[in-house]
């Protein structure tokens, strides 16, 4: 049984031809032709999630894991607007999503008809392509769909298909019509002068490679390790870089918290080479803006952000292809102490870090130390934003873990939904480490029939936005409560309502007891809520930073 609407059939056929496999549908009437078509087609896996904002982040999590486009289908009106936070995240994180919105016909727009807004080009600032379709315009619709889907073969990100349907909406046929689409293959040729780049590279005494959000890539790790044989090369990674090597520096912030001007000057790179997604560390961004490199090269097929205001080269290829060609041209006999200087600071800082953490009082910082140690090997970890991802940056991660965080727009709004979508799509056990505000903000993420039983959610509940006691400004103002938004909420009743096992910890002893059972197999997903002292967390962190001097 398929929709009688030709426009719905065209969209469904395009999704099949362009190998969309998963479709996340939110309920509504205007999208009935699409819902009927997708749910009855054997080539699609269809999932139903009521809350459109959660649905979009859930789809984002699936696409993040599969690295393939996932489609979203919703009704007309404000339902579509609820997709926007996830669309913005997908745009800046370059994650492929196909947004399919049902719409009213054009003659019903702006005349006071119900559930009707101006949907055409609604995401124009954060979308790769908007295909505004029309009923009874098959040829043009096919051309627009071909262009939209072909774009996903060239670059990654969200596309929007807006489909107006007039009533009746529920008529069906037994067979779909045939449609043709033109697949435009990506242009894989790149004009990169590796010899010219190598000449500049080899003449520089201080080269820094800074890696942002990245998928695990063992072959790339090997190439980076070879490039790092050059003593004038330093590789900095973050928690979300997923590239692990003892030679790489992965706890950037605690390394540069307390450096002097003279030390910063000596570490100022001649060439900065960046790849991957957005950088978490504000400290390294400030350092590279205050002590600008002579050259900044960025590797990315689509775009290059001028994060440090000195961008000189956009190298349009993927990171593996670049280093596969480039490492052969590197001069490894460069006489430089650049890497050894940073390594010296790293050893000093790591010793001070370990010494302080051993005796640190119960706090967010101490909790992080224990939590990161008990996450099982070869798990996937999703961190929420704000203080959570920043705390994670202070610790060396278990190299067997795969780490993700929504750093495209760095919002707290969809971390739980993204993690659950990712858990649904991966074979690995999933742990989400989240703050209380991020968790409660996205609590509808638990209203979901697709949560694997091996999902583990760790909530670090410091009774509000603890980061606002850490960053300069809010604490000195007379409006701290509006920044921190203190509360006395717990996740206990949410767990009961949505079928999660629930446990709590209030101090180090109870936490050590709870984590023993937390990762044991269960027929339900689990939540561990850890309560920390909101009046002490910022003081402990500041003492930690001072200890690194």
Where are the language model's segments positioned?
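N-terminal cofactor/phosphate-binding cores enriched in small/glycine residues
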Residues: 2-82, 88
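Glycine-rich phosphate/diphosphate-binding loops that line cofactor/substrate pockets in enzymes
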Residues: 9-20, 62-67, 149-156, 194-207, ...
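Active-site diphosphate/adenylate-binding microenvironment
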Residues: 8-16, 26-30, 34-35, 343-427
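Thiamine diphosphate
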Residues: 100, 107-120, 391-549
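Structural signature of the thiamine diphosphate
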Residues: 22, 65-74, 80-82, 90-95, ...
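Glycine-rich, anion-gripping cofactor-binding loops and their flanking helix/strand elements
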Residues: 82, 211-297, 398-426, 440-444, ...
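Glycine-rich, acidic loop regions that bind phosphate or pyrophosphate groups
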Residues: 101-148, 237-345, 450, 471-472, ...
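Phosphate/pyrophosphate-binding active-site segments
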Residues: 1-3, 290-387, 506-549
């Amino acid at each position: 049984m398929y929709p009688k609407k030709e426009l719905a059939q065209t969209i469904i056929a395009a999704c099949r031809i362009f190998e969309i496999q998963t479709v996340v549908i939110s309920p509504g009437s205007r999208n009935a032709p699409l819902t009927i078509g997708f749910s009855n087609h054997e080539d699609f896996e269809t999932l139903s999630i009521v809350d459109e904002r959660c649905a979009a982040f859930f789809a984002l999590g699936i696409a993040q894991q599969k690295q393939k486009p996932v489609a979203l289908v919703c009704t007309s009106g404000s339902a579509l607007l609820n997709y926007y936070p996830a669309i913005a995240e997908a745009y800046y994180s370059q994650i492929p999503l196909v947004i399919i919105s049902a719409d009213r016909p054009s003659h019903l727009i702006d005349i006071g008809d119900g559930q009707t807004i101006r949907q055409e080009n609604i995401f124009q600032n954060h979308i790769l392509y908007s295909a505004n379709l029309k009923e009874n315009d098959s040829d043009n619709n096919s051309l627009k769909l071909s262009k939209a889907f072909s774009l996903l073969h060239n670059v990654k990100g969200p596309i929007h298909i807006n489909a107006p349907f007039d009533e009746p909406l529920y008529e069906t046929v037994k067979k779909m019509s045939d449609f043709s689409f033109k697949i435009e293959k990506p242009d894989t040729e790149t004009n990169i002068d590796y010899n010219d780049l190598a000449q500049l590279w080899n003449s520089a005494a201080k080269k820094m490679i800074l890696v942002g959000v990245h998928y695990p890539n063992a072959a790339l790790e090997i190439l980076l390790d070879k490039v790092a044989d050059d003593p004038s090369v330093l590789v900095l990674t973050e928690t979300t870089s997923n590239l692990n090597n003892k030679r790489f520096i992965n706890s950037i912030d605690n390394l540069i918290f307390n450096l002097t001007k003279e030390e910063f000057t000596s570490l100022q790179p001649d060439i900065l080479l960046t790849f991957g997604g957005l950088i978490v560390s504000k400290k390294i961004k400030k350092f590279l803006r205050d002590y600008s490199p002579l050259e900044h090269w960025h590797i990315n097929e689509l775009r290059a952000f001028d994060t440090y205001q000195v961008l000189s080269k956009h190298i349009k290829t993927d990171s593996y292809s670049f280093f596969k060609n480039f490492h052969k041209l590197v001069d490894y006999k460069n006489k430089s102490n650049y890497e050894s200087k940073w390594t010296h600071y790293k050893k000093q800082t790591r010793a001070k870090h370990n010494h302080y953490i051993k005796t640190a009082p119960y706090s967010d910082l101490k909790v992080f130390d224990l939590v990161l140690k008990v996450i099982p090997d070869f798990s996937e970890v999703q961190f929420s934003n704000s203080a959570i991802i920043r705390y994670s940056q202070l610790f060396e991660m278990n190299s067997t873990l795969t780490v993700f965080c929504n750093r495209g727009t760095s919002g707290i709004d969809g971390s739980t939904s993204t993690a659950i979508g990712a858990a649904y799509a991966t074979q690995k056990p999933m742990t989400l480490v989240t703050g209380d505000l991020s968790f409660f903000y996205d609590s509808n993420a638990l209203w979901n029939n697709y949560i694997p039983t091996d999902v583990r959610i760790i909530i670090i509940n410091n009774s509000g936005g603890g980061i606002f006691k850490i960053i300069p400004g809010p604490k000195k103002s007379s409006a701290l409560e509006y920044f921190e938004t203190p509360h006395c909420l717990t996740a206990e009743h949410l767990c009961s309502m949505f079928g999660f096992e629930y446990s709590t910890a209030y101090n180090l002893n109870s936490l050590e007891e709870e984590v023993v059972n937390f990762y044991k197999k269960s027929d339900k997903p689990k939540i561990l809520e850890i309560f920390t002292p909101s009046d002490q967390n910022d003081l402990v962190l500041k003492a930690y930073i001072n200890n690194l001097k």
